[in-house]
Amino acid sequence: MSDNTENKALRTVEGRVVSNKMDKTVTVLVERQVKHALYGKYIKRSTKLHAHDADNACKEGDVVRVTEIAPMSKTKNWRVVEVITRAAE
């Protein structure tokens, strides 16, 4: 049996922390732009992700980079890799 555990490039996205009320978990809002199929106008689309924040270091308004991981719970399968920009206090 061959070993198929190659180093795959994990998905990483950047987003803004909109909630840090849970213990060791933050909600990250990820915005992207998609082109409308018929009219060609670029439209903003957003997704909310639950990400693991082991140190409870993230505050609301921080811009963070998150990466995909194996599921930790029903809704949490992302992990905070780094805080890019801190929110103004």
Swiss-Prot record:
Keywords assigned by UniProt, alphabetized: Ribonucleoprotein, Ribosomal protein, RNA-binding, rRNA-binding
Concerning its family, UniProt says: Belongs to the universal ribosomal protein uS17 family.
What is the name listed in the Swiss-Prot or TrEMBL entry for this protein?
Small ribosomal subunit protein uS17
Cross-referenced HAMAP family, in alphabetical order? Answer: Ribosomal_uS17_B
Q: How does it assemble?
A: Part of the 30S ribosomal subunit.
Source organism of this protein record: Stenotrophomonas maltophilia (strain R551-3)
- UniProt keyword Heme, yes or no: no
Keyword Ribonucleoprotein attached: yes
**What Gene3D superfamilies does the record point to?**
Nucleic acid-binding proteins (2.40.50.140)
Q: Name one Pfam family in it.
A: Ribosomal_S17
* Biological process terms in GO annotation: translation
Q: What domain of life does the native source organism fall in?
A: Bacteria
Q: Which PANTHER family match?
A: 40S RIBOSOMAL PROTEIN S11 FAMILY MEMBER, SMALL RIBOSOMAL SUBUNIT PROTEIN US17M
User: What GO cellular component term, any one, is given?
Assistant: cytosolic small ribosomal subunit
Q: What does this protein do?
A: One of the primary rRNA binding proteins, it binds specifically to the 5'-end of 16S ribosomal RNA.
The organism's taxonomic lineage, starting at the top: Bacteria, Pseudomonadati, Pseudomonadota, Gammaproteobacteria, Lysobacterales
For molecular function, the Gene Ontology terms on record are: rRNA binding; structural constituent of ribosome
